[in-house]
Swiss-Prot record:
Chain's role: Essential for mesoderm formation and axial patterning during embryonic development.
SMART domains: TGFB
Keyword Translocase carried by entry: no
Protein name per Swiss-Prot or TrEMBL: Nodal homolog
Length: 347
């Protein structure tokens, strides 16, 4: 994880958003006489300003390559961002083609989608581009719509399995040889977007933690052509303190007699509540279950150590304690929540 570069990345992206909001112009493109369409940045800005979020995560992938041959349409995208399990709610192709496309009056379109990792800049310019087929399916003309000047094709079903099982693409790449495509002298300019609207899986919701950290990891892996989540975890553990001094759960024995509660608590008289102690690294990793706020704070702490306080080692998961005690002459059995620390993290 190149966490030391993230603040500069965030700053550059924010500057781009500000500049794009002020100067972005509609592309002079037309599709079957439709009006010109807003640029990808302008479209994402319109979603950003939408007061009603459509999904937890909305991604726009610009096509690496596009081929339209009659009723056979081929699209290549870089899916290297795949890392965490997500539930795909909706996926659509938004086409802003540079020349008019005459759709057939009947029949269907054959759509083929490939994963094409961004080429290694160190490879020879005459080397081929490797592609891996993700799906081949048909789209009926009734599924083709127009929105904001773009031709829109709904492609949720073919792509949902890849987001549901992100490791499947990596396994396929290791098992099946990809197709070799000649590398163009200059990157092709395409105006085809794949819009992915996805929600965090139930497992991710239960785990909690920093969604921003996951996205930062995903962004860096995509830039470096890495698909493995483990890759990011291994490379993030540099410049850490001694692991024995990091935030962790330690024993913490509670004796109710010492605090004067032993007269009315029947059982237990003592129990191990555990507590949290230790340092929080900067930046903090997902193993410490940071919130988004804590993750940003830990990044700033690394660059401004004298101005920003460290995140605190504190309980992030607790469990109840069953207690038998006397209350107004009655013996009660009650389960009191948040009495025992199960996991510690940096908040």
């Amino acid at each position: 994880m190149h966490a030391h570069c993230l603040p500069f990345l965030l700053h550059a992206w924010w500057a781009l958003l500000q500049a794009g909001a002020a100067t972005v112009a509609t592309a002079l493109l037309r599709t079957r006489g439709q009006p010109s369409s807003p640029s990808p940045l302008a479209y994402m800005l319109s979603l950003y300003r939408d007061p009603l979020p459509r999904a937890d995560i909305i991604r726009s992938l610009q096509a690496e390559d596009v081929a339209v041959d009659g009723q056979n349409w081929t699209f290549a995208f870089d899916f290297s961002f795949l890392s965490q399990q997500e539930d795909l709610a909706w996926a659509e192709l938004r086409l802003q083609l540079s020349s008019p496309v005459d759709l057939p009056t009947e029949g269907s379109l054959a759509i083929e989608i490939f994963h094409q990792p961004k080429p290694d800049t160190e490879q020879a310019s005459d080397s081929c581009l490797e592609r891996f087929q993700m799906d081949l399916f048909t789209v009926t003309l009734s599924q083709v719509t127009f929105s904001l000047g773009s031709m829109v094709l709904e492609v949720t079903r073919p792509l949902s399995k890849w987001l549901k099982h992100p490791g499947a693409l990596e396994k396929q790449m290791s098992r099946v040889a990809g197709e070799c495509w000649p590398r163009p002298p200059t990157p092709p300019a395409t105006n085809v977007l794949l819009m992915l609207y996805s929600n965090l899986s139930q497992e991710q919701r239960q785990l909690g933690g920093s969604t921003l950290l996951w996205e930062a990891e995903s962004s860096w892996r995509a830039q470096e052509g890495q698909l493995s989540w483990e890759w990011g975890k291994r490379h993030r553990r540099h410049h850490l303190p001694d692991r024995s001094q990091l935030c962790r759960k330690v024993k913490f024995q509670v004796d109710f007699n010492l605090i004067g509660w032993g007269s009315w608590i029947i059982y237990p008289k003592q129990y191990n509540a555990y507590r949290c102690e230790g340092e929080c690294p900067n930046p903090v990793g997902e193993e410490f279950h940071p919130t988004n706020h804590a993750y940003i704070q830990s990044l700033l702490k690394r660059y401004q150590p004298h101005r920003v306080p460290s995140t605190c080692c504190a309980p992030v998961k607790t469990k109840p304690l069953s207690m038998l005690y006397v209350d107004n002459g009655r013996v009660l059995l009650d389960h009191h929540k948040d009495m025992i620390v199960e996991e510690c993290g940096c908040l």
